[in-house]
A protein has these predicted regions:
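Short amphipathic alpha-helical interaction segments
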Residues: 73-87
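Short amphipathic alpha-helical elements of helix-turn-helix/winged-helix folds
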Residues: 52-60, 114
């Protein structure tokens, strides 16, 4: 037989609530949307999926077309993505195929430079350029979406500058 257990009744006191909150250790993805859009516009990529696949392949070092296709399965569908990235020099053939081995590909120097630049901006090591010469988002003839992105970039750079002036106590 199962013994009966009395439930302990607790009353809530609204005036004595204790709130606990943990501050996250990392916040470098906070501005990912701004940096992602900046990279797509600046480097002339067709979509976010192109950027995502290049970032995946960058960490893979050498890859085959099969590996590219496997990772492309859960991205937006684009039949010509591989050939377009190859044609636009984002990836290149590292080893040509022979009778026993398939082609091996690698992200090109152009792609590696872009991804390194994105990582530096995410980590706060360098700001996003605000000059018209280095960033076509700041052109006077830019569309409205570019102008709203320009405002977000200015705010991001301002926040980055303030963070460098007052480093966080956890990093000392």
């Amino acid at each position: 037989m199962i013994p009966k257990v009395k439930k302990k009744v607790t009353h809530r006191r609204d005036n004595n609530k204790i709130y606990g909150r943990k501050q996250g250790d990392y916040d470098f993805l906070k501005n990912w949307a701004i940096i992602r859009k900046w990279a797509i516009i600046t480097y002339g990529l067709k979509s976010t999926a192109d950027l995502e696949i290049l970032m995946f392949l960058y960490s893979e070092k050498l890859f085959t077309r099969t590996q590219f296709a496997e990772h492309s399965n859960f991205l937006s569908w684009d039949k010509d993505r591989f050939n377009r990235l190859l044609r636009e020099d984002w990836i290149y053939i590292w080893r040509h195929r022979n009778h026993q081995e398939t082609h091996l590909y690698e992200v090109s120097y152009k792609g590696k430079k872009m991804i390194n630049s994105i990582y530096k901006k995410l980590l706060g090591l360098e700001p996003i350029p605000e000059s018209v010469r280095r960033n076509k988002i700041f052109l006077k003839t830019a569309p409205f979406s570019h102008k709203t992105l320009a405002i977000a970039i200015k705010n991001h750079n301002k926040e980055l500058k303030e963070r460098k002036l007052r480093p966080s106590p956890g990093l000392q």
